[in-house]
């Protein structure tokens, strides 16, 4: 009996080890997610952008149906289209490394938009490259990142978090068309930073808070955009607010640096314009003086 019991314990332990091994992943592990509607030449071009040979990294496929699972109803159907084109190369990084995102030939989703949406969805510590064989919105890439990350880790991300991440991506993108991508990202990050306050506020009070935040960034938002932001806020409140706030710090620093750089460029351009205007004015006065003599 003792022998049988010992064998049972050993077998159970082996099963546990096998199960944990099946879901173990390590730093440096990677996946490539390819849009299902690419032909062989386009796939070759994508791998060239990624700087790797096809077959070196495990590959998965993303379909338009996969994309619609998260984005349908959130964005104009034209943005989603009926084909999956954008592609992703994701590599797991050391704990605490954060998210690195780079894009190429993506004309709607920005790197910061992806980063924010992925953080909301629960993806951290990864290097993500997004590209396509020609210019596309890049919405399909979010689904590709989700699928690739889950394939690497062997664990499913929260369905709610993935849906909210997708909604955040779309709301940010739509807002960016009117007020600029940096401003849209910063505004939503500010909103995420006060979720512990907004969750106890009425819709009317949250709307007032959104208007205040918009004023801080010197941007105007319409009533429709405020409604969108309110809806996103209520969805974000359903997630782990403390985790979101912790992840927000590094992202906010990145956005602030981008906005500071933009301000410096704007001030430099203004200074140059003023100097050129002043110079031309001086030249004009000089010649005017010559002709008046």
Q: Whereabouts are the PLM-identified features?
A:
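Bacterial N-terminal signal peptides that target proteins for export
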Residues: 1-10
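Bacterial N-terminal signal peptides
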Residues: 10-18
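Sec-dependent signal peptide cleavage junction
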Residues: 18-26
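Acidic/histidine-rich, surface-exposed loop or edge segments in extracytoplasmic proteins
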Residues: 29-30, 92-101, 122-127, 169-170, ...
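N-terminal targeting signals for Sec/Tat export/insertion, comprising classic cleavable signal peptides
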Residues: 31-60
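Signal peptide-directed extracytoplasmic domains
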Residues: 69-125
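Soluble oligomerization/assembly scaffold segments of membrane-associated complexes
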Residues: 119, 124-219, 224, 231
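Charged, long alpha-helical assembly modules
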Residues: 219-293
């Amino acid at each position: 009996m003792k022998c049988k019991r010992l064998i049972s314990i050993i077998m159970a332990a082996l099963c546990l080890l096998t199960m944990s091994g099946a879901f173990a992943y390590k730093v440096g592990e990677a996946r490539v997610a390819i849009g299902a509607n690419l032909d062989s030449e386009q796939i070759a071009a994508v791998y060239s952008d990624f700087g790797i040979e096809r077959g070196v990294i495990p590959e998965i496929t993303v379909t338009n149906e996969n994309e619609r699972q998260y984005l349908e109803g959130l964005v104009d159907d034209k943005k989603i289209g009926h084909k999956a084109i954008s592609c992703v190369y994701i590599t797991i990084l050391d704990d605490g490394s954060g998210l690195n995102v780079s894009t190429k030939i993506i004309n709607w989703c920005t790197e910061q938009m992806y980063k924010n949406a992925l953080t909301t969805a629960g993806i951290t510590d990864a290097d993500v490259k997004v590209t396509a064989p020609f210019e596309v919105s890049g919405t399909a890439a979010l689904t590709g990142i989700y699928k690739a990350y889950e394939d690497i880790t062997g664990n499913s991300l929260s369905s709610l978090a993935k849906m909210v991440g997708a909604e955040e991506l779309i709301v940010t993108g739509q807002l960016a068309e009117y007020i600029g991508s940096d401003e849209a990202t910063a505004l939503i990050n500010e909103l995420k930073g006060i979720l512990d306050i907004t969750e106890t506020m009425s819709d009317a009070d949250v709307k007032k808070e959104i208007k205040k935040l918009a004023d801080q960034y010197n941007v105007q938002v319409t009533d429709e955009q405020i409604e969108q932001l309110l809806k996103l806020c209520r969805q974000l409140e359903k997630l782990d607010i403390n985790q979101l706030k912790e992840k927000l710090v590094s992202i906010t620093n990145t956005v602030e640096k981008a906005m500071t750089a933009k301000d410096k460029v704007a001030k430099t351009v203004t200074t140059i314009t003023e100097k050129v205007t002043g110079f031309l004015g001086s030249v004009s006065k000089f010649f005017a003086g010559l002709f008046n003599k």
